[in-house]
Amino acid sequence: MNLAGFEVGLDKPFFLIAGTCVVESEQMTIDTAGRLKEICATLGVPFIYKSSYDKANRSSGKSFRGLGMDEGLRILAEVKRQLNVPVLTDVHEIDEIAPVAAVVDVLQTPAFLCRQTDFIRACAQSGKPVNIKKGQFLAPHDMKNVIDKARDAARDAGLSEDRFMACERGVSFGYNNLVSDMRSLAIMRETGAPVVFDATHSVQLPGGQGTSSGGQREFVPVLARAALATGVAGLFMETHPNPAEAKSDGPNAVPLGRMAALLETLVTLDRAVKRVPFLENDFN
C-alpha cells in the first residue's frame, strides 16, 4: 500500500504517525512537527504528523476541545507548507469530511465510531487513505467487517480499495482501564489491511481522573516494543513538549524530549523482527 508517498507493509520499515493530541497553538504545532521530522529523517522512519482540530469526545463538556475546524486546518496546512510533511487528522461528522480531506493527506476515524456504517462509507469515499481505529469494545476479528465496509464503499465510488489501515488502541478491561492483547495485531492482519498500533491511547485510563482521562505513559515503550515484536506496519504515538501542561491526553503522551531515544530503540527492534519470517500461519 502506498501511503502519503511511501510504501507500507510488514516487509517495510514501520512508519510513524505522531504529534500532539490536539492543536493548541500554531507555534507549538510547527515546532513539534519540525522536531519529529528531524528525528524521523535521522532514523529513516517514514513520518506523518498528527493532531486534532477538535476533540469531540472529551470526558467533560468543559474540557478544551481545540481551536475549531477552520483554525485547526489552517495550522495543519501550515505544517504541510513549511515542513513538507504529510498530515493526518480525525473527523467526527460526515459533513466535516470534504473540507478536511481538502487539506490533509490521511483521515482518521475515532474508535467510538467504527461501527457507524454511513460514517465509515463517507470517509472511504473521500479519496484519502483512512486510518480506521478499532473500538475499545470490538473484537479484533470484527475489524474485517469494518474494513470490508470501507472497501465496498470505495469500490462503489470507483476508488482504490487499497487505502485503509486497521488501528489497535486497546480494549476495555473493566472500568477506567484498557489492556492490549497482542494477538489482536495478528488477527487484524488477516483483513489484508496494514495494521497500526496506537501505543499512547492504549495506556490511557479512560475517564480515570473524573472529568478527564488518566494514563500510564511509562508503559508506552513496553507496548510499542511488544507491537513491533508481534509485527505491525506502523506505530501511532502522541507526544507533547511538556505533557504536564497538555490540554488533552497529557498523562499518556510521550515527552517530546524522549522521542528520539524511544524511536532509536524501536527502529533497532523493527529491523531485527522483519529480518525473520512470521510463522503464525505455519502453526494452523
Curated annotation (Swiss-Prot):
Name this protein carries in UniProt: 2-dehydro-3-deoxyphosphooctonate aldolase
Main location class: cytoplasm
Record-listed E.C. numbers: 2.5.1.55
A single GO cellular-component term on record: cytoplasm
Alphabetized Pfam families for the sequence: DAHP_synth_1
One example GO MF annotation: 3-deoxy-8-phosphooctulonate synthase activity
UniProt-listed GO biological process terms: keto-3-deoxy-D-manno-octulosonic acid biosynthetic process
Entry annotated with the keyword Cytoplasm: yes
Gene: kdsA
Catalytic activity: D-arabinose 5-phosphate + phosphoenolpyruvate + H2O = 3-deoxy-alpha-D-manno-2-octulosonate-8-phosphate + phosphate
Keywords: Cytoplasm, Lipopolysaccharide biosynthesis, Transferase
SUPFAM superfamilies, per the entry: Aldolase
Localization (cell): Cytoplasm
Presence of the UniProt keyword Nucleotide-binding in the record: no
This protein's pathway: Carbohydrate biosynthesis; 3-deoxy-D-manno-octulosonate biosynthesis; 3-deoxy-D-manno-octulosonate from D-ribulose 5-phosphate: step 2/3; Bacterial outer membrane biogenesis; lipopolysaccharide biosynthesis
Record family assignment: Belongs to the KdsA family.
Signal sequence coordinates: none
